[in-house]
């Protein structure tokens, strides 16, 4: 019984226990209120269109009556008072449509029964031919900016996976009826260019989005198809300024009503956007976006005109898919540069790569972070000439392009990353110092200016370029991969990405700060590792905003220790990989698998053993200076853990200490300390290893990796 009680979750601090940080509940408007708001917006647009149609009909009818009176008067004068019936045969006529026509652009369920009756009566009154009005789009009918709103996206719109069956791109489960050929709609001519026979990236539309009554037949139309959106926009332009867009077919007004088949609940929960060339309305109450912002943009960029929201506008060129998405050669898996739990990286050309994300939210977060970093770094520091136009700002890699259809982002290409870099020499210690100073500056900039925490500082996420004449020298380094990044709590409900491709706005998820989802298990800062071991449900201990930056720099210190072990161990890199690093990553995979399967207790047990390997790393590199780290960690484990977990911890620590001996690095450490750059890196590692409990996160981040 005592063992079970001792294994319960407790605070990682040796002092008085305190409750973990519990974020306040999210205050989001109810689902019904969001639907009501979108319904009101659509009704306002419909009423504006009907008023425009009625005004045009009245004007044309009056002109028609006046002309008939003139013709009758001339007939009376010519025929001695005999009235003849005349018809206007030389006047081109156009039928002005009311509610029924406009319902092809908005949801039919937003109209009440009374409004439908009014629409039918208006259509009956306007059945005779009339002359169209010449009023412009800037008239009173469309001056509110809601003329011709179209529902552009639903939660079921985007779904992606790779096509392993054939070489030809196909959109599966898309049903076309009414004479349409699925093959023509999938692999045809898009944007005036013929699509290649082997596009490597495939978009799978799992759920039909909307049905249109076309000639009495239900035709399933893919709203995410570029051709259909272009056809709808071209038809609206061809109808002339000030006119109501015509249906896609030649059917009557009653046959043009739109019925949305997607789940309205998930639609309103995620995003529901109506847009045209003047305004983008969103399901976020009080937020409207200006699509004209895209005209001056070439990369994602933050628009700080709004105080309430951080809007990042994401442009897309018309031929982006032909130049990027269809140009990636994925025929051979050996071409793949990297693969992880969040996506794959493939080469595009000599200077660029594309990242194909597994989740759509991954792409949204990446481009939002890219726009935020690019804009905030613009006025901070001038870019080096070699990095201008590459998407690298303040040591942070950003996306230079995005395609939601294929879930692709474009990035600058680097030679390798720190994990795969295998040329480490003491003669190039000055380049290593510059690289880690750049990374520390990037972390401080990301936390202080952008107010975002990266939460995934690992050697795999540090990209480097090396000197081709001296592969041991690191020329530049950049931090990448914002898959786990979260904004500070004061940015909750404020981060939005607006996409030109779909005319939609996406909200960035609020911060959750679950420690089990933050950082790679092998590089997680020791204070957070202890909190997670005690409580798998623990969240980040937010007692002050400076804790975020201190935690990030502590993780960077773990990366520095990882690199120093490769640099200083006299046995060589191969022995380090098979021995030291194998022990560090031995239980990291088990922790990740347990987390995926929801076995949080097993994840906590694996992190306890990883803590033993982290402690062994510090003791090996620091020697006698690491005695305080070892004694404090052992006291923590004995005080907080059960006897069986203590025995497992001691057993694995003994195994690690037999492999990570200080004698293997002692001579190279002396050579390292003989240089100013080596002394700087060694002291930086010592300071980061001194952050061993929750209270240490309240320190001054300027003391870590000082300038």
From Swiss-Prot:
Q: Name one Pfam family in it.
A: UL97
Which species? Human cytomegalovirus (strain AD169) (HHV-5)
**Entry superkingdom:** Viruses
Q: What is its main location?
A: virion
Single GO MF descriptor:
protein serine/threonine kinase activity
Q: What is this protein called?
A: Serine/threonine protein kinase UL97
Residues that bind ATP: 337-345, 359
Q: What is the organism lineage in this UniProt record?
A: Viruses, Duplodnaviria, Heunggongvirae, Peploviricota, Herviviricetes
> What happens when you mutate residue 605 to E?
In strain: Isolate clinical C325
